[in-house]
């Protein structure tokens, strides 16, 4: 396969259309929104989204400051990015190696572990802000 072609999911080759300038910006945004739409299809992401909403409500109740909201939002954006990467890893492994293999399982487990680390970081920070405000504020 040469640089001008790519293989679609059904195995057929289609030409790659490279956009330039402002059209490239809009195309890139379209791809990003497509990724976000795909990510919303993941149950784990929807659970993380609900947890973020609950944390934001809790932050309002305890009177968190702007810095704490921004830090929580940044942690959540990182978690979204890791969840997207993990989903991409899972899709690639499933496409390349539909049979169960140790390497494929390890790749999926490592991606899942990365997500778990960010979930724990988000939870720890949210609990820190909530309890710090409640007991020291």
Swiss-Prot record:
Single GO molecular function: ATP-dependent diacylglycerol kinase activity
This protein's name: Diacylglycerol kinase
Pfam families with a match to the protein in the record: DAGK_prokar
Family as reported in the entry's similarity comment: Belongs to the bacterial diacylglycerol kinase family.
Transmembrane segments: 45-63, 69-89, 113-133
InterPro entries to which the protein is assigned, alphabetical: DAGK, DAGK_prok, DAGK_sf
Coiled-coil positions: none
Annotated organism of origin: Rhizobium meliloti (strain 1021)
Cofactor: Mg(2+)
Catalysis: reaction(s): a 1,2-diacyl-sn-glycerol + ATP = a 1,2-diacyl-sn-glycero-3-phosphate + ADP + H(+)
Localization: Cell inner membrane
Enzyme Commission (EC) number: 2.7.1.107
Gene3D superfamilies listed in its UniProt record: 1.10.287.3610
A single GO cellular-component term on record: plasma membrane
Membrane topology: Multi-pass membrane protein
Binding site for a divalent metal cation: 42, 90
Catalytic residues (positions): 83 (proton acceptor)
Function (record text): Catalyzes the ATP-dependent phosphorylation of sn-l,2-diacylglycerol (DAG) to phosphatidic acid. Involved in the recycling of diacylglycerol produced as a by-product during membrane-derived oligosaccharide (MDO) biosynthesis.
Any GO BP annotation: phosphatidic acid biosynthetic process
Keywords tagged on the record: ATP-binding, Cell inner membrane, Cell membrane, Kinase, Lipid biosynthesis, Lipid metabolism, Magnesium, Membrane, Metal-binding, Nucleotide-binding, Phospholipid biosynthesis, Phospholipid metabolism, Transferase, Transmembrane, Transmembrane helix
């Amino acid at each position: 396969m040469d640089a001008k072609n790519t293989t679609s999911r059904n195995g057929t080759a289609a030409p790659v259309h490279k956009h330039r300038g402002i059209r490239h910006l809009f195309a890139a945004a379209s791809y990003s929104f497509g990724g976000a739409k795909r990510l919303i299809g993941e149950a784990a992401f929807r659970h993380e989204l609900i947890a973020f909403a609950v944390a934001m409500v809790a932050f309002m109740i305890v009177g968190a400051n702007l810095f704490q909201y921004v830090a929580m939002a940044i942690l959540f954006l990182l978690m979204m990015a890791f969840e997207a990467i993990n989903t991409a890893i899972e899709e690639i492994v499933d496409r390349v190696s539909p049979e169960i293999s140790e390497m494929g399982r390890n790749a999926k487990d490592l991606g899942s572990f990365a997500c778990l680390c960010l979930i724990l970081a988000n939870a720890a920070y949210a609990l820190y802000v909530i309890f710090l405000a409640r007991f020291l504020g």
